[in-house]
Amino acid sequence: MGKITAIKKLKRLYRVDLSDLDEEKIYLCEDTIIHFFITIDKEVSETDLEEILAYDQFAQGKSLALYYISFKMRTGAEVRKYLLEHDINDTDQIEQVLSVLTENNLINDKSYAENFIEGKISMGSSGPYQIKQKLLTKGISNDVLSETLNEIYSEEKQIDVAYKLASKLSRTYGTRLTLKQLKDKIIQNLMNKGFSYSVSSIALDSLELEADEENEMDLLYSELDKVAKRYTKNYEGYERKQKITQALARKGFLYDDISSALRDYTFPE
């Protein structure tokens, strides 16, 4: 049977000196000191010591976890990673900490997902697929994600958010791109932000975009100058016109407009 010979308060922990035991000193948190009534001259067996140290791992883990979640909401996976990074290595103790915090609603992956999704909807910046990928990296399960997205981010809301993004893109690029280029850009941008092709198309159609013929021709002649300069170096005659026509068509210009522009175009020497 061993004995506690001294207790010294340090910055964060208590140093406890022991006699007649395998350990000469141990470091405990205040919660452990109180839980086991640790006092000088208290007798402690090796079995008692194992129980004290096991509880202290849990107590320190809980203290660290509470500190970590005090700044903002965290997922269970984030707390688990944080504890491992801070030398709480007993997986059973970690799971016990997570269980206690979850039971007290201090960790709630469903609430975390709800707040995250609602925030993204409010910002109008992300579709469901992008949101899902971000939340998966936070350690939230697929089941929780699918359920929460279905509850909060209906197709109607998705279309509303996508429409606002599409409208903004239209104002930004409307005079710099042809109608086809603009439509392609809007669809691609919306899909990159996590909206389905179906939702992206509905949002685009809702804009009811129309071509500005004068702007389309200005863009065509500007692009024609660049393409003609490139192909005049190696081609001439019919072959040159074919190469230029194909290049401009790939950029979204109409064949009739291209033919009209080429008919009166003076090629560089």
Swiss-Prot record:
Family to which the UniProt record says this protein belongs: Belongs to the RecX family.
PANTHER family: REGULATORY PROTEIN RECX FAMILY PROTEIN (PTHR33602:SF1)
Purpose of the protein: Modulates RecA activity.
One of the record's GO cellular component terms: cytoplasm
Organism superkingdom: Bacteria
Organism per entry: Lactococcus lactis subsp. cremoris (strain MG1363)
GO terms, biological process: regulation of DNA repair
Protein's recorded name: Regulatory protein RecX
